[in-house]
Curated annotation (Swiss-Prot):
Identification of the protein by name: Venom nerve growth factor 1
General function of this protein: Nerve growth factor is important for the development and maintenance of the sympathetic and sensory nervous systems. It stimulates division and differentiation of sympathetic and embryonic sensory neurons as well as basal forebrain cholinergic neurons in the brain. Its relevance in the snake venom is not clear. However, it has been shown to inhibit metalloproteinase-dependent proteolysis of platelet glycoprotein Ib alpha, suggesting a metalloproteinase inhibition to prevent metalloprotease autodigestion and/or protection against prey proteases.
Phylogenetic classification of the source organism: Eukaryota, Metazoa, Chordata, Craniata, Vertebrata
Segments forming a coiled coil: none
Quaternary structure annotation from Swiss-Prot or TrEMBL: Homodimer; non-covalently linked.
Compositional bias segments (type: Basic and acidic residues): 47-66
Region Disordered, residue ranges: 47-68
Propeptide: 19-125
Source species of the chain: Hoplocephalus stephensii (Stephens's banded snake)
Glycosylation (residues): 148
Any matching Pfam family: NGF
């Protein structure tokens, strides 16, 4: 009997010793911990990939300034708009480079090259000699190339947006306007030069005319008649005290 009890006790102890240990007591670096670390790394990597893909699908919103600049630069003009000659005006120029002196090669304020200016003035004097050196203009005018016109009044009296840059065939052109205005409303103390100040009041004023220009209509480019300065004239008013 004692032998049987002794045998059962030994078998019980051997069974306890041979039983597998709990995962809670597994030391660091054991296979169970390695599998858990690999699983965590895999989940983290998948999370990073998912986050990266989400960022690519939903990019960060751009600034308002960038959006406005991009929308203005992405407006493409149909080349067919320039095929009809009736839309062309001698005072409107589309060019990738600064415009020339002027239509008749007279002095304008746009130029920075003094030598080129002097050459063109001399050429004009040779082509159109002045026989009477006493000739003077009634009003003094100045002609300029306007390079940054953004607003103008159309033929209906509405304020419209003028296109400064025109994207044509993947090349950016600038829209230039050749404008003429009065340098001074009173070139002489009495008003216009050469008038009889005893009987007339006079002054110089800038007049406008309509030219076709590319303007914005929603997200499309369209031709419109707009007003620009084109001349300087003398206005005379009869003095009433002579009647």
């Amino acid at each position: 009997m004692s032998m049987l009890c002794y045998t059962l006790i030994i078998a019980f102890l051997i069974g306890i010793w041979a039983a597998p240990k709990s995962e809670d007591n597994v030391p660091l670096g054991s296979p169970a911990t390695s599998d858990l670390s690999d699983t965590s790394c895999a989940q983290t990597h998948e999370g990073l990939k998912t986050s990266r893909n989400t960022d690519q699908r939903h990019p960060a919103p751009k600034k308002a300034e960038d959006q406005e600049l991009g929308s203005a630069a992405n407006i493409i003009v149909n080349p067919k708009l320039f095929q009809k000659r009736r839309f062309q005006s001698p005072r409107v120029l589309f060019s990738t480079q600064p415009p020339p002196l002027s239509r008749d090669e007279q002095s304008v304020e746009f130029l920075d090259n003094e030598d080129a200016l002097n050459r063109n003035i001399r050429a004009k004097r040779e082509n159109h000699p002045v026989h009477n050196r006493g000739e003077h203009s009634v009003c003094d005018s100045i002609s300029v190339w306007v390079t940054n016109k953004t607003k103008a009044t159309d033929i209906k009296g509405n304020m419209v947006t003028v296109m400064v840059d025109v994207n044509l065939n993947n090349e950016v052109y600038k829209q230039y306007f050749f404008e003429t205005k009065c340098r001074n409303p009173n070139p002489v103390p009495s008003g216009c030069r050469g008038t009889d100040s005893r009987h007339w009041n006079s002054y110089c004023t800038t007049t406008q005319t309509f030219v076709r220009a590319l303007t914005m209509e929603g997200n499309r480019a369209s031709w419109r008649f707009i007003r620009i300065d084109t001349a300087c004239v003398c206005v005379i008013i009869r003095k009433t005290d002579n009647f």
